[in-house]
Curated annotation (Swiss-Prot):
Encoding gene, per UniProt annotation: unc-62
Annotated localization: Nucleus
SUPFAM superfamilies, per database record: Homeodomain-like
Any Pfam family: Homeobox_KN
Family according to the record: Belongs to the TALE/MEIS homeobox family.
Region named Disordered: 214-258, 295-317, 329-359, 386-419, 491-555, 615-661
Name recorded for this polypeptide: Homeobox protein unc-62
Amino acid sequence: MSADSKVWAHASADTWTTAQGISTYDLDTSSIKREKIDCHEQFNDGYGPPPGTASTDAVSYAADPTAYFNLYTNMGAAPTTTPMMHHEMGEAMKRDKEAIYAHPLYPLLVVLFEKCELATSTPRETSRDGTTSSDVCSSASFKDDLNEFVKHTQENADKQYYQPNPQLDQIMLQSIQMLRFHLLELEKVHELCDNFCNRYVTCLKGKMPLDIVGDERASSSQPPMSPGSMGHHGHSGSPSMGGAGAATPMHYPPPYEPQSVPLPENVLGGGHPLEMFPGSSMAYAMAGMAAAAASSSSSQPQPGDHPLANGGTLHSTAGASQTLLPIAVSSPSTCSSGGLRQDSTPLSGETPMANGNSMDSISEAERIRRRFYMCVIVSAGPSSSSLHQHHLHHPHHFPHHQLQPPAHHQDFLLPPPPQNIIEQSLHCAGVSMLDASLIPPSSSSSASEYHGDMMSHMYSHHDVYHHQDMTYTDYGDYGTPDVVMMSSSDVKMEDAASVSSSKSGGKKQQPGTPNGRVGKSRGRDEFSVCGSNEDGRDSVLSDSANGSQNGKRKVPKVFSKEAITKFRAWLFQNLAHPYPSEEQKKQLAKETGLTILQVNNWFINARRRIVQPMIDQNNRAGRTPHMNVCKNRRRNRSEQSPGPSPDSESDSGANYSPDPTSLAAATAMHYPGAELYMQRTMNYGGFQPFPNPAMQFMNPMMGFPVAPAVDAISQQWIDLSAPHE
């Protein structure tokens, strides 16, 4: 290796600082030393300069990038400006700043900038009257500041001298205009935020459980609102719903009165079932009837007759006061998917088993059981549901002579109250399920006449029809049959309507409606297990068999009461295999006037919402499952009658029983009162329990081996609208 090429032998940093490097920059002599080197032997791996003689040019590529960088770094950067230029620029900027500060509009610009800063950072707290504590960014405050600035400028006009500068004037005006726009935007944002917060808080106070807003109710200075002062609406509307009773966005609704929800097992005394609902309009109406019977000497109702005026007591006909058990009743407009829930009433602290927990923390089985108690108690008493619905929407008081039933009807209309809560449930369910053929002709006709007189009086005051199905609020999701929800008055009214229709030439009138009018609440979504109007149910058109106009007919978008009754009767009769065949679906669709798709969707939801919770509850209770329903499986299309599921033998084994009688009896044992029913029926020999699945909800007297009762209930379809001979 030659001496000239030794500088390429991976020289260290110290080597590059000596005179042996490629080139060095001597600041003293300002000369560049060049050396001719041969790098062929050193960079023979392809990473060095190409073979040959390196360039001797001063600006050629250096062998070491570090040396090449240091070469030009040591030279230093030449200054772009001289100190004199910096001085001149500083003087010009200083003059511009002084011109801006001395401008007459500068104080207004400063005020606007400070207002924008305060409007952005200052928290806004809304008081109860809807006003805000901070108005720093309001339009009124800006106008006040502007007037103050003009006044100050006019007072000091003779003391100030300003030389016009068009460029600076334009800049100042644009700056003030920009800040003013920003202030307006901040004001609008604050207004929208306040409006949203007030609406949100108001909506929460109307929808959330009462214990959440208990502190607000206690600290509020407003007087509590009683049901009598709430007008014809019966509840305060939410601003988001846009109702007539809705509060304005900037105001808070009046607080609610505290209520407690006693459990059925905590009820010690066995009073009338209507005592379970003092917070409902039904209790107020029936309380007025009892008070009218007790104080027949007076012509007008006394203030003390109202349940709330007596401290929650109900005067009976005997003169004794019966304590009302407070309970929160679900709103009739509640639906599984119809919007926000209006009930969701939690257990208050007055209930022994409340412990501050809401209804959502209760198990599914407990919720089904409690709601079943409410269901059967609501349906107790003839025409009570109609009175309840009418009084709910039109809370006026009838005269005493019209509220008081005739003397020969009192024994039938007001049966003796049961002794305990289980007998209450069975008694109420039995009254609802009584067939017209089991009622004496005189009692049935007289009751229908009295009920018709009451309905005609109601329509003479208000020509609005509220069907009994409005009481069916929150029970459809948990599988309580619709038959339980029907009171005996509706059964008799439908029977009378059917007989009258057969006499008038087959033109059938709607039960319970004058002149056959159908109310708006007929066939609401509460009857449908689906819980909402799906796309296929809104405006479905199907081919018509009789060749009607345009060859098509309208399919109802909601399920009628008769259709739900048929569907549920089929479901409870085929609990062993709740999968209807294609022929059965077609038959059901033809009888109900629905499409096969609607029938199929109903049974899909019924298996999920009715059958499956029953199986889950039996499993949680430790009982042996007596049914086998395959979850989330697609049933093979077959034209055969319902039978055991394909995997019944492998899943259930010897415990599986395809007998629908024993299956329904074992399945229905989780309903309240079923044990008492079984105990009573076993005392009458070998009569088989529950010959029909629907009998689990009936009165114990209907379980006796009486031929007419069994034959009337054991039909395949429970058609309550058909005339009974």
